[in-house]
């Protein structure tokens, strides 16, 4: 289903998760990996992030995963391809572990998103039968992440690049901005513009970001989409 070798391994894990159980707990595949896989593998993403915005369902998942079964609690029964290679660690922010597929480690996390509520995904919002965040919630969560860390060089401005590569219709992007602003106010648009300006003004920075994320699409195309993103949020 996916072209990149690491994404194929992520796809294997997705296909072995208990999709119905995760949906029942309002736990959705999100973050940069879900976006990269859904929008054409324009970059490589290495970790798996699931997101829950319901405290009751998060509590139930925390109890499930911190029990004796560990990750097996949310996997299909009798599977042999995925193994847990790190103890489950759970706190008020998330549930974290690492999985192995063919001796390749993959970080796995379920994050409690307490700032915005997620809408229920539709049938089109799936990867390997696993429900993902909707495009609206993917964008809103990326807008929040961008405000948190756009100036962190180690992040390589991936949040604004992900938003640009999604190519959301203007109306949907503005709806995502409004949703993110419920948590962070007008800093959402301000920080988005700052991130774009940083990419434009720091010589060679976009090249460095693209290299770090193994992006092979033309740089001119990335610039085109970043500039379109800025126009949408400043009109």
Label the model's feature ranges.
Residues 1-235:
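Compositionally biased terminal segments of proteins
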